[in-house]
Amino acid sequence: MMARRTVDFKKLIEQLRARATDKAEALNTVSQLEIGAVDAQDVTASAVRAFVGALPSSGYHFGFVRQNVVFYLLSHATVQTARDPLYAAEQLHEQLDRFLRHQHDGGGDEDRLPFYHNGATLTAFQKLLQTLREIQTVIAEQSGGTAAAADLIASNNASTERRGKKGGSSSGGQQPLVRRVITQLETAATEARPYVNCRAVAELLDLTYQRLIYWACTLMPYVLFRRDTDTELDTVLLMHFFYTHYRSVNGDLAVEFQNYVKNSVRHMSSFVSSDIDGDQKPGAEHMRDVSYKLFVGNLQARDASGLMFPIISTRISTVNLYLSPERMFFHPGLISRLLSEEVSPRANLDAYARVCDRVLEDHLHTPRRVQRLLDLTQMVMRLVELGFNHDTCAAYAQMALIQPASQKSSLFVSEIREKLIQIIYNFYTFFMCLYVYSPTFLFDHRRRLILEQHRSTLIGSKEELQHVWSNVTLNVNTHFAVQYTEEDFEAHTKGATEAEREYLYRDLHSKWGVHLFTLRPSRGAAGAASPLPPLDGVTRSDILRECALVNLNEGRVNYASLLAFSHHPEFPSIFAQLVVVTEFSEIFGIPQGLFQAVGSPRLFALIQLCRVLLPEQVTLYQNLVSIYNLTTFVKHIDAAVFKTVRDCVFDIATTLEHLSGVPVTPNVDLLAELMARSVAHNLYTTVNPLIEDVMRSSAGSLRNYLRHTRLCFGLARGRARLSEDGVTVYVEVQGQYGLRVPTTRFVEQLRELVRRDRLLAENLRGLNERLLSVRVRVRQISSDTEEVSRHAKGHRTVAQMSKALKKTASKIKMLETRVTLALEQAQRSNGAVVTAVQRALAVFDVLSRENLERRGAQLCLTEATSLLHRHRALAPMTWPAGTGVAAAAEADGALREFLEAPWESAPQPPRLRMTPDTDHEESTAGATSVPEVLGARYEPAHLAASDLLNWYIVPVSQAQQDILSSIDPPAGSTSVSLPPASP
């Protein structure tokens, strides 16, 4: 269970009163507040008076705290624990104001510290609260739809209508109100700049910025983004996008979509696939929702039936005809195809390549430094116009994540894929940062965690994508350039003493971390107020003796005896070697289960020692504070948290080696346990979704392929015989069942079998790639543990975790191998059946009417005979001897269903009576000279000899000549007339 970050303010005051005469103990006490925080709801006027009265009158930074207590409490108070942070801040202001009204001395020196004295700080805080209350009221009214907000929006909408309905990222609707509120907030943040590092101020700005950004990003009406040049497919995808993600301002789209589909349904049939397995085609799973809503003509419908329906096509050849290239990112199925490289190198991808190049050039290759929130919101509108928001970017990032790093595709296709990944990863991290943005140190921490965590997730060990992440990092730091500069610090601390500057800088360093500037002594600063006693006759032996007596087991710091030695030249080296290294190693050897109770207090005591006795080692202090906060107050140890702790530990080891002059090997017991929690969290949050995606996207294809394999097995077990007249096919299934199928239907079903085999093979191509991506992700997680493993050879937890990861990767590899082998065996056996079917179909194709007319009967019959001879020369197909009865029965049932079920009531081909009248009718009607092989058949009439009079009767030689000339006409001739009947 994580500890509370806030300290008990009343208890802290009591501790100060009890130790008022001991400045070192007083420093320990206030350090609890400075490293943690005080709950703003616990701060009252009387408590503030008691706090000031309990502080020592001199020493360290106590004088600054007593004179500028309003700034000090705002710097270390938190409002995040309150249900309504802004109300809690207003109550805090009221209590601080009450405290100042009863003070005889306003506190602080207005001339020396114009920004930090109590009166100026409280006035600035009050002004900020008033502005934030106004902004949050507007946002709440907008969200709640009050009358005042409605009137304002109506006036804005009216002005927008006068400008027309042309789409794009032009302002309109509620955008003027958004711009006004953003300007108001940015002005308030600029005026509060001297206090932006106060925790209470930073939290309020952080909360308001995030609420404003979220509100502004939901105001995306479809009317602003549609174009007159949009195709039917463009319109359907855009309506679905804006209704799904921005329904609050697009409620009327439901009716508009219904009417549009009703009036354009004929055109829309061109870009949907009605194949029975259309939802199993590459990328189709991402089009299922919009396809269902298009199918029923209702944006509010949800697919809960499990039925089949037409799916919007993801084929490049089809999409090219019906989708505008600049709308490509509204089509997730297309993006999935391009990312998986499920496209032919011959496909026309030039238009999409140009769109990618334009997006990269406009937004990513030469990013402009963003100075205002308004610039960010305008960029959001441009990205929405392209089809990007947080949800779509997350979906596209997941698509890219499950694809293997390299595939056997043409260079052009691979280049498009790499451009897509660069675009997606950039915009994904942009939206991740945007929704937690504020110009404060709180966002600076989040930005670093986002970059660290998503670098591990999205890039990992993929060397070919490292340059992509370098571009992502550059763009994030450019778009969200949040920092507190040395110029700001010098301007705000003008007139402060060195002790005050040191306290303020250390506080900044604990909040901003290593990205902060390095403090330089101020020329005009007043003298330091350090409580160090004089250094008289101190020897190395004295330092060694005092350092050997330090013991932090009780979690208390008693460094009064060491203060006299801290300015000795050899003190940092001896103190680091005998105290810090030892304590550092012992603390990180405490099991995690005991760390809250035992390790955390000792770590806090070590922080205090380093703060007082090694004041110049600010980085060491900051790393210790970071570890303390992350191990004490953070609940979920993910990859970013673990890597931060790990990096801090090894940075501390490097610093201590430099100070002590001896090698330092950190104890990794605690790191190993944190690593185990991080790995478990990573497996749950990154590998599990990949496995679920494999199951979701491939389950249908596997089921269909299993049915297809059973059918092919049934065909291999069966025998087919053509009737004498060629009209019917008789199928025997191991002599047990007899099927009678019209030849035309039989041929059609065989063609369907060949087509389905090709489609299913295409659908299953990505299964192995997805399984490979799971294994690659596990390998990336393993690589995150390598640095700890190098320092912990033989460590039990590390060894167990490495073994578990290897076992997981091995099982995934084994599953991948089993699936691959099973599919290869099935494809091999299915391929043999399909090849045999294709040979049979080749005979029918050779004897088709078109072929006979074009090439003549003699050549076609010769080729067909050759095909039959080659087919008969092949060995008959067999099946494994151990095939079970149940499997054989399932295969036979699949064959019966395949051949019989769809055609139970199918009509037989028409029969023509062979009479003089019908023959004459066929000739006079201009019928083609060569009928279909599987078409209508003559039915010989049983006529008497007298009925044959006046019909075609010639000598045998003449008949032979006429027959041959009619079925193999001379070149240029299309028909042969029968000679007149002889009497």
Swiss-Prot record:
Residues 474-983 are annotated as: Interaction with large tegument protein. InterPro entries: Herpes_U30, HSV_ITP. It is found in: Virion tegument; Host cytoplasm; Host nucleus; Host Golgi apparatus, Host trans-Golgi network. Coiled coil: none annotated. Residues 902-932 are annotated as: Disordered. Its main location: virion. GO terms for cellular component: host cell Golgi apparatus; host cell nucleus; host cell viral assembly compartment; viral tegument. Keywords: Host cytoplasm, Host Golgi apparatus, Host nucleus, Virion, Virion tegument. Residues 914-923 have a biased composition (Basic and acidic residues). One of its GO terms (biological process) is virion assembly. Pfam families: Herpes_U30. Interacts (via C-terminus) with the large tegument protein/LTP (via N-terminus). Plays an essential role in cytoplasmic secondary envelopment during viral egress. Interacts with the capsid via the large tegument protein/LTP and participates in its transport to the host trans-Golgi network (TGN) where secondary envelopment occurs. Modulates tegumentation and capsid accumulation at the viral assembly complex. HAMAP family: HSV_ITP (MF_04043). Belongs to the herpesviridae inner tegument protein family. This is Inner tegument protein. The gene is UL47.
